[in-house]
Amino acid sequence: MKVSSLLPSVLLLVGATRASPHPAQPPQQQPLNNIIEESNTQTNPPNKHDLEHVIDTSPLLSLHRDLVKFESISGNEADVGDFLIQYLQARDFKVEKQIVVPKGPKGQGERFNIYAYPNSTPEPRVLLSSHMDTVPPYIPYSLDLPSSNGSTTDSLNWRDNILIAGRGSVDAKASVASQILAVLEYLQLHPEAPLGLLFVVGEEVDGIGMQYFSQSELNTSPPTVHTVIFGEPTELALVSGHKGSLFFKISAKGKAAHSGYPWLGQSAVSALLPALVKLDTLADIPVEDGGIPGSEKLGKSTINIGRIDAGIASNVVPASAEASVNIRLAYHDVEKVKEIVTKAVDEATNGDENVTIEWGNKGKGHAPIDFDTDVDGFKVMTVNYATDAWYLKFHEGSGGSPEGRVHTYLYGPGSIFVAHGADEAITVRDLEDAVSGYKKLIEAAFERNKV
């Protein structure tokens, strides 16, 4: 590729992006198309500079890069949040910084949501939302190209297959970046479109950001929005529903003693083990035998004993033991599942009062949640993971929708199978296809709610 032949177009693209804060100039994206076409026709093997050039010359890919380079593990979202505020304000957005956790005495620890909309349209009707936080550990941003099998197709389409890795590259900074670009590009053609963006903290832990937003004045009563599009890794499919979630801790108390004389003590581990063995089977045994129900739509409920802590040393009879358990619920009745768990533990331990259950999330748990899938042209699937969409509780009212309810969608680039893993990564094509997908959902929402 001849860089010199691209330089005027690149300078035009960069200049247009920086010089005008409002994205009202449709021509500014045209040079990017030329760059894409020329990049995809290069026959020489691309080098590191070629990969970086693709990122640098794309508003979408460079924004995604900038986001992933921030370490924003849950609780540490402030830096990436400040960056997003500046980015959106420079593009003529009104940004409301919603403080969720205030700064500490030394100015540390501030956590905030970002609620943004064009200055020209202060009441969004369509809201796109995702989260700024990631799971640990931080993995630096990097670029790579999957090995080619030597085919002509591979050599021509190398740009689409560039692999962008790093923590959050999929979950969920891919959604954040593609949602922003979708909104900017839609506004270029429809400058008065009432669109909004909501980026929250804490989705990966406790949903604190969405809970705070849901209880705030920004979640208006009655709703002003008629559509909310949540961004998570769905492999560019519309999700018709995801499982609920129930966390709990099961603990046992014992009495410490020398391991050479275990009869002088009481092992908390021995008390806990029968309960864990029973719990481990609850999603696999028939309901009539005390198992946890599933559903036709979401399949089986699943149970995971994710952490066990006990004792202080191998030569001491353990005086305490506990396990953390998570059930992914395909069944709608959370209270019924809690009854099933309680009964199973009681039967397995013969009613041992030293074994107790502590329900997480203030004992509430989350039932499965459904989403809309009424837009043509998308694959439709269900997922086993949960999102913070459960926490967004709409007030009574139609949100301007003739159907009398707020429509919700779950969609985004990347695969959940690599999210949270050491190999978290996404391709250029997935990111760019997501922008088109989000714009299609936006357009369908406005078409559906035409008066």
Curated annotation (Swiss-Prot):
Keyword Protease: yes
Enzyme class: hydrolase
Signal peptide (from-to): 1-19
Residues binding Zn(2+) 2, per UniProt: 171
Glycosylation sites: 149, 354
Active-site feature positions: 203
Entry cofactors: Zn(2+)
Keywords carried by this UniProt record: Glycoprotein, Hydrolase, Metal-binding, Protease, Secreted, Signal, Zinc
A Pfam family the protein falls into: Peptidase_M20
Protein name: Probable carboxypeptidase PMAA_093910
Species name: Talaromyces marneffei (strain ATCC 18224 / CBS 334.59 / QM 7333) (Penicillium marneffei)
